[in-house]
Regions:
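Phosphate-interacting basic helix/loop segments used at nucleotide- and nucleic-acid interfaces
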Residues: 1-14, 66-67
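Short hydrophobic/charged patches on amphipathic alpha-helices used for structural packing
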Residues: 4, 126, 204-205
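Conserved P-loop NTPase
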Residues: 271-300
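Switch/coupling sub-region of P-loop NTPases
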Residues: 132-141, 153-279
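Glycine-rich, charged/polar anion/phosphate-binding loops
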Residues: 67-69, 80-85, 166, 202, ...
Length: 300
């Protein structure tokens, strides 16, 4: 396939195709001064690109058609694939986005070496994780939330049991006692099939029966936060990621619909680790944990 080379490159983080007549673009971990790099890979026609994305979908056991023009799936290697087919929902035609995840877990030592965390921040988060606290890694999109979350999980003692719940399995954990659950979507099949969907809320409740020491949700967006809060109250270590620009914005999002977290439940959260992309001296961009904010009760 035309994108075989970037797919095999472990330093390529994202591959994007916005139209058949535009060059394939990618995000590269070693060239952080650029947002997107344009390659010399192009497709000759819309039909060629459609045929390719259909073959790609079939390799994952799914289909993408004019009747079902949106597909969100995962490759056998664990990479996330998003496709829009033809011009049913996207202009000017078929588009593709592939998010490639590291094949091996990134350790805390690596995160410190790359400057994502200072040694003091790392020590604090390590202690909080070992003590089974409730940690939310928050930040905007593509700011390194999942990478930081994965590195925190490597600090958990190997004798502890970890349960992860995700829409798309992204986390890689070097633990023998690791239970990984993922959602099942029946979108686009039929209205009756929606009864067989398995969402994050149901998975978090199911995970409690596996007696994990830690429950990890890839990202909270809805009612699964209720089950996660209950798990924290029961003494489980809880970690998750969340989209927010600041601790104040995170708290505001948690308070309003569809999350609607009661004020008292916010005190269960130990801290927010805030990540973002920052521009360094020389123009390069890097992901950094900029702040660790603890939740403190207001004085009455």
């Amino acid at each position: 396939e035309k994108i075989h080379v970037p797919m095999m490159d472990p330093d390529v983080e994202e591959i994007g195709i916005t139209a058949w007549n535009k060059p394939v673009a990618l995000v590269h971990r070693r060239f952080t001064e650029y947002d997107w790099l344009f390659t010399n890979i192009t497709y000759h026609s819309e039909d060629e690109l459609r045929n390719f994305v259909q073959r790609l979908a079939q390799k994952t056991g799914k289909t993408v058609t004019v009747a079902k023009p949106i597909l969100d799936t995962m490759s056998r290697e664990g990479d996330r694939i998003a496709i829009t087919f033809a011009d049913e929902v996207s202009r000017p035609g078929t588009t593709l986005a592939i998010r490639k995840f590291p094949r091996e877990p990134l350790t805390m030592a690596y995160i410190i070496k790359t400057g994502t965390l200072t040694p003091l921040m790392a020590a604090y988060l390590w202690i909080m994780t070992e003590q089974k606290k409730y940690i939310i890694v928050a930040g905007p999109m593509a700011s390194g939330k999942t990478t930081l979350l994965g590195s925190l999980l490597t600090t958990i003692p190997p004798t502890r049991k970890i349960g992860t719940v995700e829409d798309t399995p992204e986390l890689r954990i070097p633990h023998e006692q690791w239970e990984s659950l993922k959602t099942r979507s029946m979108w686009g099949v039929s209205e009756e099939a929606s009864a067989f969907e398995v969402d994050l809320f149901g998975l978090v409740k199911a995970m409690l029966r596996f007696r994990p020491d830690y429950i990890v949700v890839g990202e909270v967006r809805g009612e699964e936060i209720v089950a996660l809060n209950q798990a924290a109250l029961l003494g489980h270590g809880c970690l998750t990621t969340f989209h927010a620009e600041s601790p104040e914005a995170a708290l505001a999002r948690l308070r309003v619909s569809p999350l609607n977290v009661p004020e008292g439940h916010l005190l269960i959260i130990t801290c927010f680790a805030m990540t973002n992309r920052v521009q360094l001296h020389g123009g390069t961009w890097a992901r950094r944990c900029l702040e660790i904010a603890e939740i403190e009760p207001k004085e009455s």
